[in-house]
């Protein structure tokens, strides 16, 4: 008897990828064969994102594409878009089941109970009912795993639907997360990215502290590198910074959301810090880790953002000189306070501001990578091969390429860094360990 086939289509954040990977393992343990997203399948699972209107549109288009390619397949949609607008998704041709984030852990059981295609079924719940914690970590990548430690957010920023899509901040106990990290190590992966919706807010459920989680994970044998996927500036404490600086396992790599370099815009966004506080946190990182990779999120075109506000943001970022910028044009989301804010910014103006910051990002990232030319660093090489080259990352997230050598995959090598190419990749020459 031929085993049933399932594929996964994951949109959005690292948390979604960790959850999709866990769901896929359940299907495989239940007798299914996981196939590639573009392969013919009996079950197609879409794990959706809803951070912007563009993300919603991308999900709708993906569902239609899946149905055209696999008209007989059962299509299941879960994730944040499914949580926020289940009926909208259920109305799309080809969709059979829509599951809220609360019911994501029931996905395999619900699919197994379906007799075949039919009228779309959906589950829904309010944000206050989002209390389940779906434990998840990614597998399959030979080098890096994403470990979900926290879910939900209590911040309710003026532009954001995450609280409604993910519920209140909650977490797994440290002891359980250590066991999951040990499973990852046993599978041969060497790097863990610690991920969540508001990762630094860890501990709301158990009364534990994020710093204590970091210390516990630091003791797991077999894991050689940790990265913190993202942390709010007001939660990036001196204690966390000092620990990351002192631990050989925790990489000098920080992703810190700013959103605007204008204090008046930050206040309207309902963010929990000022630009002075943000700059002070960056300085605290650089005092102990001068060559840390710092990535910053920025939103442009927020209602009321004047040209002067944007110039202030641009100049603030230029002074901070992060290694990378993640730039987003403001996207109006129904149900958020920002929908009713006056002084909307024209899309053409927002687009021009995005382009200006993208140009700044290219310059800053190039400068950050070029500073390593002629130095020696440790690189964890991944299984990716293009044009006879393998690629890997230094601890502070500079990408390095070297001639492919299978024996070096998933190992940390001492590498002499040479010239940087047009993609900001550094040429690497492996030095005997």
Language model feature labels by segment:
Residues 45, 80, 107, 194, ...:
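Residue-level signal for inorganic ion chemistry
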Residues 32-33, 73, 96, 223-224, ...:
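A structural micro-motif
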Residues 76, 84-85, 186-307:
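Conserved SAM/AdoMet-binding glycine-rich loop
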Residues 340-433:
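Terminal RNA-binding accessory module
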């Amino acid at each position: 008897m031929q085993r049933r086939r399932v594929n996964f289509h994951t949109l959005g954040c690292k948390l979604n990828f960790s959850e999709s990977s866990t769901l896929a393992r359940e299907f495989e343990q239940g007798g299914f064969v996981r196939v590639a997203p573009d392969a013919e399948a009996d079950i197609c699972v879409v794990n959706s994102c809803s951070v912007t209107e563009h993300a919603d549109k991308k999900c709708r288009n993906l569902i239609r594409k899946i149905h055209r390619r696999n008209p007989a397949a059962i299509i299941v949609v879960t994730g944040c878009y499914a949580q926020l607008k289940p009926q909208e998704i259920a109305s799309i041709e080809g969709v059979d089941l829509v599951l809220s984030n609360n019911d994501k852990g029931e996905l395999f059981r619900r699919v197994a109970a379906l007799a075949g295609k039919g009228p779309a079924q959906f589950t829904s719940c309010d944000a206050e009912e989002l209390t389940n914690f779906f434990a998840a970590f990614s597998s399959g990548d030979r080098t890096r795993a994403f470990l979900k430690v926290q879910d939900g957010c209590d911040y309710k920023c003026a532009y954001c639907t995450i609280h409604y899509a993910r519920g209140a901040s909650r977490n797994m106990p440290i002891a359980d997360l250590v066991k999951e990290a040990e499973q990852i190590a046993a599978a041969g992966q060497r790097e863990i990215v610690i991920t969540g919706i508001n990762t630094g807010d860890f501990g709301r459920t158990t009364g534990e502290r994020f710093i204590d989680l970091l210390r516990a994970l630091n003791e797991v044998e077999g894991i050689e590198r940790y990265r913190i996927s993202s942390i709010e500036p007001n939660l990036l404490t001196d204690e966390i910074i000092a620990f990351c600086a002192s631990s050989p396992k925790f990489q000098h790599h920080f992703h810190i959301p700013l959103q605007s370099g204008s204090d008046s815009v930050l206040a309207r966004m309902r963010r929990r810090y000022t630009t002075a506080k943000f700059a002070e946190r960056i300085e605290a990182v650089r005092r102990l880790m001068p060559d840390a990779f710092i990535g910053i999120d920025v939103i442009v075109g927020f209602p009321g953002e004047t040209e002067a506000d944007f110039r202030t943001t641009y100049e603030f970022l230029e002074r901070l000189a992060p290694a990378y910028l993640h730039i987003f044009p403001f996207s109006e989301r129904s149900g958020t306070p920002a929908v009713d804010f006056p002084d909307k910014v024209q899309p053409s103006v927002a687009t021009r501001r995005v382009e200006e910051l993208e140009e700044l990002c290219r310059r800053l990232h190039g400068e950050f990578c070029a500073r390593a030319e002629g130095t020696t660093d440790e690189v964890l090489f991944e299984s990716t091969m293009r044009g006879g080259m393998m690629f890997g990352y230094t601890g502070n997230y500079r990408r390095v390429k070297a001639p492919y050598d299978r024996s070096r995959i998933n190992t940390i090598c001492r590498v002499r860094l040479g010239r940087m190419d047009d993609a900001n990749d550094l040429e690497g020459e492996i030095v005997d360990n």
